[in-house]
């Protein structure tokens, strides 16, 4: 199982966003942008098409759940989260609880995770998907919630030695009013069969990364 409750992350960015960037209009057009985009667009590289039998074999390998999917399936169930959120570096954490219900879908290929909880007296709900792409050898996660209208996508790998995955991506900072994106890093650790930890890192007011959130998950009996 894994999952950040991104509504916490979004709220933290509202407090800690770096506001020393100047605002720009959404309608601003830089001359030559369209021309540059056209000239820098990558063209598909030609390749030799394999025979039909090889194509079917390759596709079968790509679509068949493997060890990573079995690991994801072991995280199925209901989990209680003890949430600590830091609005600013060095500040006292705000505490709350959350609930996550995980299950595998589409023949054990993806994890679907539904989250509920409260933050600052307001109810929230979120939904995550987690995939392991057999071709790219990469975990891909998506997140939507009732605190926004976008979809967050994070990607990263699994480290067997530390039993953890590190996922990175970007999130819109809605407080900026400029669609400014900020970098997000998530570290998800397996403690044992019934305990997991998720840590979320993002930029503080000085632009330096700090831990914004930590969720300690315990599997419900």
Segments predicted by a language model, with ranges:
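Residue-level recognition of beta-strand termini and adjacent short loop/turns
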Residues: 106, 190-194
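Central antiparallel beta-sheet cores of small beta-barrel/beta-sandwich binding domains
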Residues: 82-185
